[in-house]
Curated annotation (Swiss-Prot):
Cofactor list: a divalent metal cation
Keywords: ATP-binding, Cytoplasm, Kinase, NAD, NADP, Nucleotide-binding, Transferase
Any single GO CC term annotated in Swiss-Prot or TrEMBL for this entry: cytoplasm
SUPFAM superfamilies: NAD kinase/diacylglycerol kinase-like
InterPro entries: ATP-NAD_kinase_N, ATP-NAD_kinase_PpnK-typ_C, NAD/diacylglycerol_kinase_sf, NADK
Organism per entry: Oceanobacillus iheyensis (strain DSM 14371 / CIP 107618 / JCM 11309 / KCTC 3954 / HTE831)
Pfam family, one: NAD_kinase
Protein name as catalogued: NAD kinase 1
NCBIfam families named in the record: PRK04885.1 (NF003424)
Catalytic activity: NAD(+) + ATP = ADP + NADP(+) + H(+)
Matching Gene3D superfamilies: Probable inorganic polyphosphate/atp-NAD kinase, domain 1, Probable inorganic polyphosphate/atp-NAD kinase, domain 2
Root EC class: transferase
UniProt binding sites for NAD(+): D45, G46, N122, E123, R149, D151, A186
Length: 267
């Protein structure tokens, strides 16, 4: 089996990376940066997102697993004290995988400009580049739903619903659900302007279009990176046909993670 390790880069993560690379190689596994069957993230959720986007072109062939060297993460099941056990599990046990849905974002430019298709593991956050209010015609399944005015719109996956989406008051969704969630960021509501004011959860066969009603430059944050877009005609969001695969060597129920991160005094 081929493997690759993506490290946060701090001393602790680098030591774990070096140890895992040495021992897994001694067990007969091959360190392969180009075509890994398993990508091991050592760091936090940010490192995991970096690893995902680095190998997003290999989703059908590559599975991911994470070791957290900081605070508990939603994508990093293993701790530094478990590394030796994980090494043995990877070397000796054919791993099982669980698949979770992704968000597909397609940004189309006006007047024959290019089309940019991006996959997100967590979310896409859409704002104007100059900090002014965004004004979108929101379409769902090809029908006008509302005109949104506000600071921005967040579209998240179920596995990303505990991140930016939660901070905006969105619901936490179990990552096995094939859906996306649309959450408002500081919408403008008064006697003249009105939005739904609640998160919307769309199933996989529903598509959302955001069409700018005012010419603006947009900052679109996809997971851990941000891109600037001009002359945007529409932003299309839906559940992607691709899925991310997580390697599983032990059970770590999702609701336990939620409890430990947000509720438990020991989390």
């Amino acid at each position: 089996m081929n493997f690759k390790i993506v490290s946060k880069g701090d001393d602790r993560s680098e030591k774990i990376k070096a140890m895992m690379r040495q021992y897994l190689s001694e067990f007969g596994l091959t360190y392969d940066k180009e075509t890994p069957d398993l990508v091991i993230s050592v760091g936090g959720d940010g490192t995991f997102l970096e690893a995902f986007h680095r190998y997003v072109h290999r989703l059908e062939d590559t599975a991911f697993i994470g070791i957290h060297t900081g605070h508990l993460g939603f994508y990093t099941d293993w701790t530094p004290k478990d590394v030796e056990r994980l090494i043995i599990e990877i070397a000796k046990t054919p791993f099982q995988t669980v698949e979770y849905p992704l968000l597909e974002v397609i940004i189309r430019a006006k007047a024959g400009g290019k089309e940019d298709r991006i996959l997100a593991l967590n979310e896409a956050m859409i704002k104007t580049a100059d900090g002014s209010s965004v004004v979108f015609d929101v379409e769902i399944k090809g029908e006008h739903f509302e005109t949104f005015r506000g600071d921005g719109i967040c579209i998240s996956t179920p596995s990303g619903s505990t991140a930016y989406n939660k901070a905006l008051g969105g619901a936490i969704l179990h990552p096995s659900l094939e859906a996306i969630q649309i959450t408002e960021n500081a919408s403008i509501n008064n006697r003249v302007f009105r939005t739904i004011g609640s998160p919307l959860i769309l199933p996989k066969h529903h598509t959302c279009f955001l069409k700018p009603m005012v010419d603006s430059s947009f900052l679109i944050q996809i997971d851990h990176f941000t891109k600037n877009y001009q002359n945007v005609k529409s932003i299309q969001c839906r559940v992607a046909k691709e899925k991310v695969r997580f390697a599983r060597f032990k059970q770590f129920p999702f609701w336990n993670r939620v409890r430990d991160s947000f509720v438990s005094e020991e989390g």
